[in-house]
Amino acid sequence: MAALVSVKDLVKTYPNGTRALDGVTLDIQRREFVVLIGLSGSGKSTLLRCINRLVEPTSGTVTFEGIDVTRASGAELRRIRRRIGMIFQQFNLVKRSSVFANVLAGRLGYRTTWRTIASRPTRLDVMHVFENLGRVGIADRAFGRADALSGGQQQRVGIARALMQEPELMLADEPVASLDPATSHSVMKYLEEINKKDGITVICSLHFLSLARRYGTRVIALKGGRVAFDGLPADIDDGRFKEIYGEDAVEVEIGPSRDPER
């Protein structure tokens, strides 16, 4: 079976000379829940952003569903991007707008302009907004402002917005980095549900190995822009951990969820 995402010899060098990715090659299969781990600056965020071309690679190729993302432009690139949802560390919401409007924005890739979506949302779009907000437990907050929500609730809005794209692939860039441990588990469980129930492939970057072990079906570790480990979460023992994070690193456990915001 052909890979959903195929990355080959991917290099990204920023204008300041930093080589964030140094020849990354990997395949992501459909329905996998892949967790990217590594130190800050190891290339995790850059890799995610190269997959949907929010960052332009310096060289190498990325294909999605057999289409060369690195060569795509115009309408073809827009078609690719609407099939790839993205969840951001800092939520990336329009804080002064309503929760409803933020989630509705996930349909932008299917309409010509934001004005046509905002002024004339279809009945089906409205139904899907409430359906996706219901999935993450905050349909009752639809007409409140996004900035009135807690961090965990704002991230759930981000998940609902990404689901509006009807994606084949969900990219999550440090989605729980600014959340407390219990809320982190709550958000990760929604991503797990999307993966298991909807069959959406998930690639999620995380700081904490304990979360990677709990939710990932596969772990890829980056170090200095290169793949340092690619395998099962259970195969990362203490030796592997120190190879990835350094000899002085100490693993921090994220405790069990109490789901305080559900």
Predicted regions, residues:
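Conserved ABC ATPase signature
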Residues: 145-149, 153
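Helix-to-loop junction immediately C-terminal to a conserved catalytic motif
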Residues: 52
